[in-house]
């Protein structure tokens, strides 16, 4: 598995839609963002889009792994690569938003992210179709953050 930084416009839309089902929202955060990919035999099997949202703060807008490649450590490897790259760019804090239940709760906690806010009704307001997971509609967004240590970037 190879991890690379790449133009976010070259990341497969179908893969980004795995994490964010609103193509219009994806199109809105791609310009000016950083793109990262996990490559297997030169095929993008994991993708991440992050962007600057404050002086030393970045947000991970999207991170996804192809469904047939999940549960193989690709997402965790990609996330580590992204965090290292953001630290090298001088980013001191990384934020992201997730649903309020599901696998992402433990996933991001394992990587050190902590909940710092709840945005009530976010998915009801910003998505035209209900977002469902395990038969339950996601309504609220959990805002999570991680402080990057200056030494997270490996030489």
Task: Spell out what each predicted region is.
Residues 63-71, 99:
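A short, internal acetyl-CoA/4′-phosphopantetheine-binding micro-motif in the GNAT/acyltransferase core
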Residues 60, 82-86, 104:
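Short hydrophobic clusters on alpha-helical segments that form packing/core surfaces
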Residues 86-99:
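Conserved GNAT acetyl-CoA-binding A-motif
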Residues 1-8, 142, 147-155:
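Conserved N-terminal entry element of GNAT/NAT acetyltransferase domains
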Residues 71-84, 110:
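Conserved acetyl-CoA-binding loop-helix of GNAT-fold acetyltransferases
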Residues 33, 138-143:
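Short hydrophobic/aromatic beta-strand or adjacent loop that forms the aromatic wall/cage
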Residues 2-66, 79:
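Acetyl-CoA-dependent GNAT
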Residues 95-97, 109, 114-137:
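Conserved catalytic-core motifs of GNAT/GCN5-like acyltransferases
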């Amino acid at each position: 598995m190879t991890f690379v930084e790449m133009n976010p416009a070259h990341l497969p839309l179908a893969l980004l839609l795995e994490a964010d089902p609103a193509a219009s929202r994806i199109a809105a955060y791609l310009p000016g963002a950083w793109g990262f990919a996990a490559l297997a035999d030169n095929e993008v099997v994991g993708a991440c889009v992050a962007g600057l949202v404050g002086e030393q703060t970045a947000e991970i807008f999207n991170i996804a792994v192809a469904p047939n490649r999940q549960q193989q450590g690709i997402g965790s490897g990609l996330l580590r690569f992204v965090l290292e790259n953001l630290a090298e760019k001088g980013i001191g804090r990384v934020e992201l938003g997730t649903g309020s239940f599901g696998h992402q709760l433990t996933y991001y906690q394992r990587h050190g992210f902590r909940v710092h806010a709840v945005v009530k009704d976010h998915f009801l307001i910003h998505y035209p179709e209900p977002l469902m997971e395990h038969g339950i509609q996601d309504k609220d967004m959990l805002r999570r953050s991680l402080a990057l240590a200056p030494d997270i970037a490996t030489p």
